[in-house]
Amino acid sequence: MFSSAVRALCRTVPTVATRQLSTSRALLSLRPLGPKNTVPAFKGTAVVDGDFKVISDQDYKGKWLVMFFYPLDFTFVCPTEIIAYGDRANEFRSLGAEVVACSCDSHFSHLAWVNTPRKDGGLGDMDIPLLADFNKKIADSFGVLDKESGLSYRGLFLIDPSGTVRHTTCNDLPVGRSVDETLRVLKAFQFSDKHGEVCPADWHEDSPTIKPGVATSKEYFNKVNK
């Protein structure tokens, strides 16, 4: 599924072990956890602020949670995603949301990656937890595990304060995800939940929304279709 590491990871030298990822036919049979499902219970050791900490789904009760999976530490697309989400963690927190990144690596691998400088392909200091799923149970419960390779695909789940999945995406390995889009969708669900109106395509905070109903929706359609 992927080739062996070209060079061994050395903890004392900031050298990145190169990992080559390829796609699998197993992706065709993946069934990521969809909207309206209850988030599975999870618990594991994460790297938080440069140390090990056990975290679980219970830590996020009453909060919005962005839970995203990535294939492997010390790869190429993955650090760009994790750094992008980590660098904007406070934007999520301002909306009452937390972000957790998870892969099937060990917490020791996560720590080595955090301790590797970004200029060498590492993560550097992180403002979000990196959860270790070494036994692959978490990825499997969320439906993003490729059992042939033991990798998790790029699944992302937006979970509301009641523990209900509201939004799911799952990318094939070569393409990373958008922080801007995740924030947009989070704000849209929060607006809809609060106001009871629905959000049309490409909705942003300054965009009109729709009052659901045959008659009431015409206010929106008349406004945007002049």
From Swiss-Prot:
<comment type="similarity">
    <text>Belongs to the peroxiredoxin family. AhpC/Prx1 subfamily.</text>
</comment>
<protein>
    <recommendedName>
        <fullName>Probable peroxiredoxin prdx-3</fullName>
        <ecNumber>1.11.1.24</ecNumber>
    </recommendedName>
</protein>
<dbReference type="InterPro" id="IPR036249">
    <property type="entry name" value="Thioredoxin-like_sf"/>
</dbReference>
<dbReference type="InterPro" id="IPR050217">
    <property type="entry name" value="Peroxiredoxin"/>
</dbReference>
<dbReference type="GO" id="GO:0005739">
    <property type="term" value="C:mitochondrion"/>
</dbReference>
<dbReference type="Pfam" id="PF10417">
    <property type="entry name" value="1-cysPrx_C"/>
</dbReference>
<dbReference type="GO" id="GO:0042744">
    <property type="term" value="P:hydrogen peroxide catabolic process"/>
</dbReference>
<dbReference type="InterPro" id="IPR013766">
    <property type="entry name" value="Thioredoxin_domain"/>
</dbReference>
<dbReference type="GO" id="GO:0006979">
    <property type="term" value="P:response to oxidative stress"/>
</dbReference>
<dbReference type="InterPro" id="IPR024706">
    <property type="entry name" value="Peroxiredoxin_AhpC-typ"/>
</dbReference>
<dbReference type="Pfam" id="PF00578">
    <property type="entry name" value="AhpC-TSA"/>
</dbReference>
<keyword id="KW-1015">Disulfide bond</keyword>
<comment type="function">
    <text>Thiol-specific peroxidase that catalyzes the reduction of hydrogen peroxide and organic hydroperoxides to water and alcohols, respectively. Plays a role in cell protection against oxidative stress by detoxifying peroxides and as sensor of hydrogen peroxide-mediated signaling events.</text>
</comment>
<keyword id="KW-0575">Peroxidase</keyword>
<feature type="domain" description="Thioredoxin">
    <location>
        <begin position="33"/>
        <end position="191"/>
    </location>
</feature>
<keyword id="KW-0049">Antioxidant</keyword>
<dbReference type="InterPro" id="IPR019479">
    <property type="entry name" value="Peroxiredoxin_C"/>
</dbReference>
<feature type="active site" description="Cysteine sulfenic acid (-SOH) intermediate">
    <location>
        <position position="78"/>
    </location>
</feature>
<dbReference type="GO" id="GO:0045454">
    <property type="term" value="P:cell redox homeostasis"/>
</dbReference>
<dbReference type="GO" id="GO:0005829">
    <property type="term" value="C:cytosol"/>
</dbReference>
<dbReference type="GO" id="GO:0008379">
    <property type="term" value="F:thioredoxin peroxidase activity"/>
</dbReference>
<keyword id="KW-0676">Redox-active center</keyword>
<keyword id="KW-0560">Oxidoreductase</keyword>
<dbReference type="InterPro" id="IPR000866">
    <property type="entry name" value="AhpC/TSA"/>
</dbReference>
<comment type="subunit">
    <text>Homodimer; disulfide-linked, upon oxidation.</text>
</comment>
